[in-house]
From Swiss-Prot:
Residues 107-119, 149-166 have a biased composition (Polar residues). This is Zinc finger protein 768. Residues 1-166, 239-258 are annotated as: Disordered. SUPFAM superfamilies: beta-beta-alpha zinc fingers (SSF57667). It comes from Homo sapiens (Human). GO terms for cellular component: chromosome; nucleus.
Length: 540
C-alpha cells in the first residue's frame, strides 16, 4: 500500500481524511489512542455503540479538564511540532518563540469564554486585543483548515521593526504616566499641562483620580502681580510696544492704567504701541494711506475709509429720528445732540456750552486770539482751517458754489444761501429797533450797530466812521495805496477782493446777472440794477 503524499512539514500521524476532519466523529478519533479506536471499531461493527450527538461549534471535554489561566495562550492540536527540527510555517513568517512547548490534547478543548489562538501569535504590547468585542469561537471543522487559519494570523505575526519600536515607546510612556514621581524629573501630575502647575494653590480643579475641589475662580488684586500669573499672561516676555494691546499692557477702562509707550519727541504716553506709531506720524508727517481716486494721503487707515465715502456717496449712519444719513459715526453723534439738546463741552472761560468738541476748540481761540492757519500768498492768519480755504479762493478765483436759478457762483457756501433768498424775496432777519428786514444775519448785525452809539470804527487819518472793522481796513488802503489782490492774467492790483472778482469777468466774459424782463445779462450787479431802472421808468 502506497503512502499518500503529505503536505510539507506534516507527519503521517497528523494526517486524517478530509471527511473525518469535517465531522465530530472524526475529530474525536483524532484525539483517542489506538486501543480506544479498536474498541469503537468493534462496537460499530456489532452495532452496540451509539455516538452521542454533539452540538455544532462545541468541542468535547475530557473529565480531567481544567480551565487555563488568563496568561495561558490556548493552542490548536493540529500544528504542534513533534520533533525539534519541525517547521510548519510558510516562508516569510517569524519563527515561534522557544518558550512555547508542545501541549497535550487535553488543552485543546477550551471553555467558550476562552478564545482559540494561533501558536505563532504573541501580543506585542500589554493590553493588546487582536479581536473585536463581538468575536465568537469558531467551529472545530473551521479551525482544522490550516491554510485559512494561517492566513488569519499572518498579519498579526509578521510585524515590522518600526511597530515593535512604537510598542516599546508606548509601554515606556504608559509606565511614566502611571509612575510620574519615578519617571518624570519635573514631577508633573497626570493629565495636567506644565503651565497649570503655576496655578496650584489658587483653587484649580485637578484632573485624574485626585479629589475634586471647588471650581476655579480668577484671582484679583495682589495675586495678579505674582510672577506666576505674569508668566501666564505674557509667556514670551514681550514688553512695551511689542506686546501691543493686552490686559496688563493696554489701557484700562475709564482712562486709568499703565502707559508704557512714550513718544520720544513730545513725551506723550500711550497704552498701546499701535497708538504710539499713529501718533508719531504727526511729527514725521508720514501719510502711508493714499486714495486711489484723488491721490489724497492720510496718516490713518480709518481717515482714508471716511474720505473714500465722499467719492462713493455712501452714508451708512442714519439718524433714527429724522432719517438723515451721515458718512461718519461721529457726525451722526453730533447730529443726535441737536435732537436731545445735549451740550457736554463747556468753555472754562465764559461758560458757553457746545455739542461738539471741535466747536469748543474753535471758540476757545477767540479767547486766546490764536490764529494757527496762515495764507501762503498774503500771510493772513485765521483761527479755522475752513476760513483759510475760503480765503485762498480769493487768490485763485475759484467759485465752486453756483446758484441753480441764475447761475451765479460764489467762493463760499455761506454767500450762496443769502443769494438764493434774494430770488424768493425772502428776508427772514428783522431789525428789532426799526423793523427793517434783511436776507442775511450778518447784514442785520451791521445794521444794528447804527442804533448803538459809540460802536463805530473811525479812520485815524481822515476821521471817517464805519460800522464794520473790515470796511475800515479796506478804507485805510486808500491812504496807504496797498493793493494786495492782484489779477493772475494781467497783473492788475486791487484793494478789495470783490473788485478783483469783478475784474476777472472782463477776461472770462462771464455775465452772471440777468434781467428778468428782457433777458439781458451783465457782469456786475450794479450794472443790472441800473438797467432795471429803465424798465421801471417805462412802466410809469
Amino acid at each position: 500500500m502506497e503512502r499518500e503524499a503529505l503536505p510539507w512539514g506534516l507527519e503521517p500521524q497528523d494526517v486524517q481524511s478530509s471527511d473525518e476532519m469535517r465531522s465530530p466523529e472524526g475529530y474525536l478519533r483524532g484525539n483517542m489512542s489506538e486501543n480506544e479506536e479498536e474498541e469503537i471499531s468493534q462496537q460499530e461493527g456489532s452495532g452496540d455503540y451509539e455516538v452521542e450527538e454533539i452540538p455544532f461549534g462545541l468541542e468535547p471535554q475530557s473529565p480531567g479538564f481544567e480551565p487555563q489561566s488568563p496568561e495561558f495562550e490556548p493552542q490548536s492540536p493540529r500544528f504542534e511540532p513533534e520533533s525539534p527540527g519541525f517547521e510548519s510555517r510558510s516562508p516569510g513568517l517569524v519563527p515561534p518563540s522557544p518558550e512555547f512547548a508542545p501541549r497535550s490534547p487535553e488543552s485543546d478543548s477550551q471553555s467558550p469564554e476562552f478564545e482559540s489562538q494561533s501558536p505563532r501569535y504573541e501580543p506585542q504590547s500589554p493590553g493588546y486585543e487582536p479581536r473585536s468585542p463581538g468575536y465568537e469561537p469558531r467551529s472545530p471543522g473551521y479551525e482544522s483548515e490550516s491554510s485559512r487559519y494561517e492566513s488569519q494570523n499572518t498579519e498579526l505575526k509578521t510585524q515590522s521593526p518600526e511597530f515593535e519600536a512604537q510598542s516599546s515607546k508606548f509601554q515606556e510612556g504608559a509606565e511614566m504616566l502611571l509612575n510620574p514621581e519615578e519617571k518624570s524629573p519635573l514631577n508633573i501630575s497626570v493629565g495636567v499641562h506644565p503651565l497649570d502647575s503655576f496655578t496650584q494653590g489658587f483653587g484649580e480643579q485637578p484632573t485624574g483620580d485626585l479629589p475634586i475641589g471647588p471650581p476655579f475662580e480668577m484671582p484679583t488684586g495682589a495675586l495678579l502681580s505674582t510672577p506666576q500669573f505674569e508668566m501666564l499672561q505674557n509667556p514670551l516676555g514681550l514688553t512695551g510696544a511689542l506686546r501691543g494691546p493686552g490686559r496688563r499692557g493696554g489701557r484700562a477702562r475709564g482712562g486709568q492704567g499703565p502707559r508704557p509707550n512714550i513718544c520720544g519727541i513730545c513725551g506723550k504716553s500711550f497704552g498701546r504701541g499701535s497708538t504710539l506709531i499713529q501718533h508719531q506720524r504727526i511729527h514725521t508727517g508720514e501719510k502711508p494711506y493714499k486714495c486711489e481716486v484723488c491721490s489724497k494721503a492720510f496718516s490713518q487707515s480709518s481717515d482714508l475709509i471716511k474720505h473714500q465715502r465722499t467719492h462713493t456717496g455712501e452714508r451708512p449712519y442714519k439718524c433714527p429720528r429724522c432719517g438723515k444719513a451721515f458718512a461718519d459715526s461721529s457726525y451722526l453723534l453730533r447730529h443726535q445732540r441737536t435732537h436731545s439738546g445735549q451740550k457736554p463741552y463747556k468753555c472754562p472761560h465764559c461758560g458757553k456750552a457746545f455739542g461738539d468738541s471741535s466747536y469748543l476748540l474753535r471758540h476757545q481761540r477767540t479767547h486766546s486770539h490764536e490764529r494757527p492757519y496762515s495764507c501762503t500768498e498774503c500771510g493772513k492768519c485765521y483761527s479755522q482751517n475752513s476760513s483759510l480755504r475760503s480765503h485762498q479762493r480769493v487768490h485763485t478765483g475759484q467759485r465752486p458754489f453756483s446758484c441753480g436759478i441764475c447761475g451765479k457762483s460764489f467762493s463760499q457756501r455761506s454767500a450762496l444761501i443769502p443769494h438764493a433768498r434774494s430770488h424768493a424775496r425772502e428776508k427772514p432777519f428783522k431789525c428789532p429797533e426799526c423793523g427793517k428786514r434783511f436776507g442775511q444775519s450778518s447784514v442785520l448785525a451791521i445794521h444794528a450797530r447804527t442804533h448803538l452809539p459809540g460802536r463805530t470804527y473811525s479812520c485815524p487819518d481822515c476821521g471817517k466812521t464805519f460800522n464794520r472793522s473790515s470796511t475800515l481796513i479796506q478804507h485805510q488802503r486808500s491812504h496807504t495805496g496797498e493793493r494786495p489782490y492782484r489779477c493772475a492774467v494781467c497783473g492788475k492790483g486791487f484793494c478789495r477782493s470783490s473788485t478783483l472778482l469783478q475784474h476777472h469777468r472782463v477776461h472770462s466774459g462771464e455775465r452772471p446777472y440777468k434781467c428778468d424782463d428782457c433777458g439781458k445779462a451783465f457782469s456786475q450787479s450794479s450794472d443790472l440794477i441800473r438797467h432795471q431802472r429803465t424798465h421801471a421808468a417805462g412802466r410809469r
